[in-house]
Regions:
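Short, positively charged, Gly/Tyr-enriched micro-motifs
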Residues: 1-44
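Surface-exposed, charged/polar loop-rich segments
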Residues: 50-76, 183-248, 254
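Short, conserved catalytic/metal-binding motifs centered on acidic residues
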Residues: 16, 105-109, 130, 165-168, ...
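Active-site beta-loop-alpha junctions of metal-dependent nucleic acid enzymes
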Residues: 112-114, 135-157
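Structured nucleic-acid-interacting core domains from mobile-element enzymes and related host factors
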Residues: 43-118, 124-125, 244-249, 260, ...
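Conserved beta-strand -> loop -> alpha-helix junction used to position metal-binding or nucleic-acid-contacting
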Residues: 34-37, 129, 133-135, 164-171, ...
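Core residues of folded domains in eukaryotic genome-function proteins
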Residues: 15, 28, 70, 82-84, ...
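Charge-rich, intrinsically disordered regulatory segments
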Residues: 4, 12, 21, 151-158, ...
Length: 598
């Protein structure tokens, strides 16, 4: 039915009806009303009632049988009720091998009718596009759930834990990361913290002093500089005893850029990339989805995301940006970087012409230089370049290369003055190049496993699946490559048939089918997430809210209604006190269970 296709595209029911009216020439020619569409949608959702979780597990296990690189695991509670799961496919696992140095993790809600929490692991590829490494569904946001999810993520990724992970300030998640990723640098989302200043400071203080606090946070190059600037800003604003600011200062090692600028972050300092990913996926999914509906729509969104990456790969392979100068380094890097990173490098190279280099000191081991802008203002500060002569290494105080992986304008100015015409390989980060995805990826740690036959078969299948997938990605970028690989597949397929006829096929028994499961999986309960509850109203909003109106006397804001209004005649119906209290509870709700005051 066309309505089901509209629903899969996340077209609201009211808009579906308008489209049917336009197609039919008016509402009188449609043959049904909007209520009929809603009833049909409900009947489709009811088809999965009671078997939704089991259908989801069956689907994932069938995916695992079709592709041995697909990873999936789940857990149930003591009542065999579905509580959490994690999944990732071969494309995401291979992407993690190339781009898994930095991971952004953030949870979101309203993606399925059970309220299960959607928890994707995302990163950034060589085109600076958001990519998915894996996903989880959780029934709660407790430490145990996060520990389970992070362990499954680690189990799926042969590359190991990321170097850096960016999250919000959730204490349960923070504890879980310290347990599962003890060597990973954990950073809090800077954007979220900066946005809280307007809530935590009174309006006058925020207006007068926020800019100086923000400058201390964003423009400090070292931890000493930040602490000095922060202390001055707190003193000027008389905020030394502010509880929240004191807490944030104690946590400064987890969110202030000065403490992280030496750690590669792929240019990210917040979880906004994860939140933009949430917004992208929510264009395809809704809170009414069953688990299977969610997965079907999620996969459609994922295919769209990966198509954009293939388009960018195609552009890099078949289009060449126009050179802006005759500097040899420019013609070198235009063939190395992806278009996105090339444009960033070009901007740095263009800006480098506005800087001059001043020698401070040169010794046997180090050379110290100041790099200053020709049009430097009194507020701008020079950058300090350190040249380590022994290894011919260049370090700039702006730390852009360490943080983003792109040589800064100060380094390029130094190279130009010293007639370095080609960028040394040590300053070319492979993850930003067109060859970034040319990496080895083997999910098994033992190439020559001598174990049970089914393990040997699985090991061989994993390796061949990866190589075939990598070839398909490369060949599909061009028509010629597609035709060539297709012909080679036909040739190899015939050779494999002949080979298997003359060779003993070694392997093991088939994996147990999901339908052989001993105990049925129960659908998850509707989950009340920590963000639920009635919205807390400000005192101003409460003051302007109108009270109850008695329909007997017409007065508003009184403590009675028509049933016990004193202005009515003696024959009026008067209910007892218990009924009145029951009515009040129904109108206003109770604090316990319906409001989250924490």
């Amino acid at each position: 039915m066309l309505s089901q296709q509209f629903a899969e595209a996340n077209v609201p029911t009211c808009q579906q009806m308008r489209l049917f009216e336009i197609e039919s020439g008016g509402p009188e020619h449609v043959g049904f009303i909007e209520r009929d569409i809603r009833n049909y949608e409900q009947s489709v959702r009811d088809e999965h009632k009671g078997i939704d979780a089991e259908t989801l597990v069956d689907f994932f296990e069938s995916e695992k049988e079709k592709n041995s690189l697909f990873f999936f695991d789940y857990e149930t509670d003591s009542d065999n009720r579905f509580t959490r799961c994690f999944w990732t496919d071969h494309v995401s696992r291979r992407a993690y091998t190339a781009f898994g140095d930095v991971v952004v993790f953030d949870t979101t809600y309203n993606t399925n009718k059970y309220g299960m929490i959607f928890a994707p692991f995302v990163g950034v590829n060589h085109h600076h596009q958001t990519i998915l490494f894996g996903c989880g569904l959780l029934s709660d946001e407790k430490t145990d759930s996060f520990v389970w999810l992070l362990n499954k993520f680690l189990e799926a990724m042969c590359q190991g834990a990321p170097n850096l992970i960016i999250t919000d300030q959730d204490p349960a998640l923070t504890k879980a990361i310290s347990q599962v990723f003890p060597r990973t640098t954990h950073r809090y989302c800077l954007w979220h913290i900066l946005n809280k200043f307007s809530e935590k400071l009174n309006p006058m203080t925020f207006r007068d002093h926020y800019e100086s606090i923000r400058n201390a946070i964003l423009h400090s190059s070292t931890d000493e500089e930040f602490e000095s600037s922060w202390e001055a800003a707190m003193s000027n604003a008389n905020l030394e005893q502010h509880d929240w600011l004191s807490l944030m200062f104690d946590l400064r090692h987890k969110w202030v850029p000065a403490y992280f600028n030496h750690v590669f972050s792929a240019g990210m300092s917040s979880s906004q990339r994860s939140e933009s990913s949430h917004a992208f996926f929510k264009r395809y999914i809704s809170s009414k989805n069953s688990l299977m509906d969610f997965i079907i729509r999620f996969n459609k969104a994922l295919r769209h995301q990966r198509h954009n990456e293939l388009v960018a790969d195609h552009v890099d392979m078949n289009e060449r940006p126009k050179l802006q100068s005759k500097w040899p380094m420019e013609s070198q890097m235009v063939t190395v970087y992806t278009k996105k990173k090339w444009l960033e490098f070009l901007e740095e190279m263009s800006q480098s012409h506005g800087y001059y280099v001043q020698t401070e000191s040169v010794g046997n081991e180090f050379g110290i230089y100041k790099v200053m802008n020709f049009q430097a203002s009194s507020s701008s500060k020079p950058r300090v370049l350190t040249h380590v002569i022994q290894g011919d290494d260049i370090l700039c105080s702006c730390m852009k290369f360490q943080f983003e992986g792109i040589p800064c304008r100060h380094m390029l100015a130094f190279f130009r003055i010293n007639q370095v015409f080609h960028l040394p390989d040590k300053y070319i980060l492979k993850r930003w190049t067109q060859a970034a995805k040319n990496v080895e990826f083997f999910p098994t740690d033992e190439p020559n496993v001598v174990e049970a036959p089914e393990r040997c078969l699985m090991s061989r299948h994993l390796r061949l699946s990866y190589k075939a997938s990598a070839l398909v990605d490369i060949a599909s970028l061009t028509v010629e490559g597609t035709n060539f690989l297709n012909a080679q597949f036909d040739y190899i397929g015939n050779k494999m048939k002949d080979l298997n006829m003359t060779t003993t096929v070694s392997g093991g028994s088939q994996c147990r089918r999901a339908t052989d499961r001993a105990v049925d999986i129960v659908d998850p309960q509707k989950i009340r997430t920590k963000g639920c509850g009635k919205r807390l109203k400000s005192s101003k909003e409460n003051a302007t809210t109108q009270g109850r109106k008695c329909r007997g006397c017409g007065r508003r804001g009184v403590q009675h209604d028509k049933r016990n209004c004193p202005n009515l005649q003696d024959g009026s119906t008067i209910n007892n006190k218990n009924e009145e209290e029951s009515s009040d509870d129904e109108d206003f709700g109770s604090i316990d269970g319906s409001n989250n005051w924490i």
